[in-house]
Amino acid sequence: MARRKNVSGIARDALAFILEASRSTHPHEFAGLLRSDGRLISEVVLVPGTTSDEGSARMLLDMMPLDMSIVGSVHSHPVRDLRFSEADIDMFGAKGYYNIIVAYPYTDKDWVCYSPDGEKVSLPVVEADQ
């Protein structure tokens, strides 16, 4: 299982990027990896070769960077459903502790973070310079 990293929140700019990328790829899913600056989730890493459609997004494991600052994953659901699927929960542990799902219509209220076990994780949105 993925170990929990000491992350105190997600940078507002990183969340804004996630929401905009999800809108831009709609009705297909968006997927990426979450990178921490040691304090906050501050960036989204786009994995080469990622493909998606209306029902799923697939990241190629052999294209994922060897990067110790990766703390989780993000993907969108093009419907109004923030619940994870069995496929989502299977992927969560492989990508890190923090696993964000965003759902249509992709506003700042349409996201949730889960642990690899499927438990909701509190992840405050903060300004990166705080």
Model-derived features: positions:
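Conserved beta-strand-loop surface patch within small alpha/beta domains used
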Residues: 1-70, 79-130
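Conserved, mostly hydrophobic/aromatic
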Residues: 73
